């Protein structure tokens, strides 16, 4: 791979296929790349992250006051939303991860139109380059569309055409 900073790379694949190994090799060879692994903050993907409004965020900080600084450390504010990389927080507080899991957008937690709007708006807002994304385009969204929204191949392809158009900097 060249050291071109004007591209983004998307690594997809089934579990155990070597995605993380490939990602690490790419970053070793191209240290300028910004890495978005599953569970990290990503400008396009919300898997393994809690996505909440201000009231929900403040309630979580109050409920888990003893680790509120750690929560803040793993939070990114994006518009009027707060994104917590909660799976990165190591704690032995019973139920913490399960509690924050309810704020994820996947696994049937959002209606189809809502998840579609969230995902498309994030892709439209993303205009940066120099990223390498792990499991950020196909895996989590496709799984959600099939398992929880019962979308057929044509409906899934239509949404991905919209997402691809949103990423196209010429449109």
What are these regions (language model features)?
Residues 11:
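Hydrophobic anchor at the beta1->P-loop junction of P-loop NTPases
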Residues 20:
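Walker A/P-loop
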Residues 1-6:
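Phosphate-binding P-loop
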Residues 17:
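ATP-binding Walker
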Residues 102, 106, 110, 114-128, ...:
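ATP-dependent NMP and nucleoside kinases share a basic, alpha-helical "lid"
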Residues 14:
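P-loop (Walker A) phosphate-binding loop of NTP-binding proteins
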Residues 27-87, 144-145:
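Conserved substrate/cofactor phosphate-moiety recognition/catalytic segment
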